[in-house]
């Protein structure tokens, strides 16, 4: 590579400035003499720190080039593997495609949970920085921050109308927020340790929470009273989720089990134990997926004539399992993630499963053929959470890299 006379002169002056400002006096005077430089005050100012600036910008640009190359390769792959430019897909089969539509930063610590609002075009993220942030997923704009917790916010959940938001935290409290005025209406105390999960029941009258104190509690939304406690897990309860009609709740724990409870009687209806490590996440199958699941697993239709209910679980043993809750049988195990599975849910079309993990990926599974059909390198660090919009073609992910990413499905 040949430099022009002017470039050579600039480089020499930048080197001379570097030598002098870093105290290499002898080298400076020799270099100045050999390069025949006449340095003066005015020129000096122009070249001050120039070498360092160029040096750092080269590294920055190299990183950018590598990022763009990887995005280009992903786009090429999309194109050849019959991506959205190939045949037209049924919207029920749309899946998230790289690159992300938005990468949103604002949190100062790892993002612990991301969820879509059931009505408006906003989503909400919770973080270890003790805040909850609201974003517009269509424009990528940051809207506001909800402050009140004094430690890491572990989980968040909307009621079906989206007027109420609940959050739980390592500060051992559960908070209820009016999502129209963005005020905290109520704070609930009762757990003796980190509250790791919270969910508003489908009827909106109650909410359930799970904690490191090994219990699950049910609370009345109107009064904030604890009305039920479910005991049985032998270790930290990681997540709790009600089924569609609110008659059952599922929970998973560090004791390596998934439990299903009957809300009315508090009895444990099923204890699902096949994972070989902490079970991090669970998700109920929507009824729209029942026929696909029955077809894929050959699971018998029961005497009642209705299949299911079905449940997904993701574990630190790097696997995802699908369960038939009525029989307690594990219907399938999906293997592919290279690290702890942190989030799992059904695609709204019912034919696919989406998952995220500490291997920094977001994966789409064609469970009928038990194969991973798409892997997106989603974040720079562990992917802690994901959500799939019920009606709009978007997926959102949150990560230890402190960002929230919005992915468009097509």
From Swiss-Prot:
In the record, N6-acetyllysine modifications are located at: 53
* Main location class: cytoplasm
Region span, Interaction with DCX: 367-409
Q: What are the UniProt keywords, alphabetically?
A: Acetylation, Cell cycle, Cell division, Coiled coil, Cytoplasm, Cytoskeleton, Developmental protein, Differentiation, Lipid degradation, Lipid metabolism, Membrane, Microtubule, Mitosis, Neurogenesis, Nucleus, Phosphoprotein, Repeat, Transport, WD repeat
Q: What is a single cellular component term in the Gene Ontology annotation?
A: 1-alkyl-2-acetylglycerophosphocholine esterase complex
CDD domains tied to this protein? WD40
Residue ranges of WD repeats: 106-147, 148-187, 190-229, 232-271, 274-333, 336-377, 378-410
Q: Which GO molecular function annotations are given, in alphabetical order?
A: dynein complex binding; protein heterodimerization activity
SUPFAM superfamilies, per the entry? Lissencephaly-1 protein (Lis-1, PAF-AH alpha) N-terminal domain (SSF109925), WD40 repeat-like (SSF50978)
- Location of the region described as Interaction with NDE1 in the Swiss-Prot/TrEMBL record: 1-66
Q: Which GO terms describe its biological process?
A: adult locomotory behavior; brain morphogenesis; cell division; cerebral cortex development; corpus callosum morphogenesis; establishment of mitotic spindle orientation; lipid catabolic process; microtubule organizing center organization
User: Which residue windows are coiled coil?
Assistant: 56-82
Query: Any idea where the LisH domain is?
Result: 7-39
The record's subcellular locations are: Cytoplasm, Cytoskeleton; Cytoplasm, Cytoskeleton, Microtubule organizing center, Centrosome; Cytoplasm, Cytoskeleton, Spindle; Nucleus membrane
Q: Which Pfam families match?
A: LisH_PAC1, WD40
Note the superkingdom of the native organism.
Eukaryota
- Region called Required for self-association and interaction with PAFAH1B2 and PAFAH1B3, residue ranges: 1-38
Where are the Phosphoserine modifications? 109
Cite the residue spans of the region called Interaction with dynein and dynactin. Answer: 83-410
Region (Interaction with NDEL1), start-end ranges: 1-102, 388-410
InterPro entries assigned: Dynein_regulator_LIS1 (IPR017252), G-protein_beta_WD-40_rep (IPR020472), LIS1_N (IPR037190), LisH (IPR006594), PAC1-like_LisH-like_dom (IPR056795), WD40/YVTN_repeat-like_dom_sf (IPR015943), WD40_repeat_CS (IPR019775), WD40_repeat_dom_sf (IPR036322)
The entry's family comment says:
Belongs to the WD repeat LIS1/nudF family.
**Which PANTHER family does its entry note?**
WD REPEAT-CONTAINING PROTEIN POP1
User: How are the domains described in the entry?
Assistant: Dimerization mediated by the LisH domain may be required to activate dynein.
Q: State whether it acts alone or in a complex, and with which partners, per the record.
A: Can self-associate. Component of the cytosolic PAF-AH (I) heterotetrameric enzyme, which is composed of PAFAH1B1 (beta), PAFAH1B2 (alpha2) and PAFAH1B3 (alpha1) subunits. The catalytic activity of the enzyme resides in the alpha1 (PAFAH1B3) and alpha2 (PAFAH1B2) subunits, whereas the beta subunit (PAFAH1B1) has regulatory activity. Trimer formation is not essential for the catalytic activity.
Protein's name in the database: Platelet-activating factor acetylhydrolase IB subunit alpha
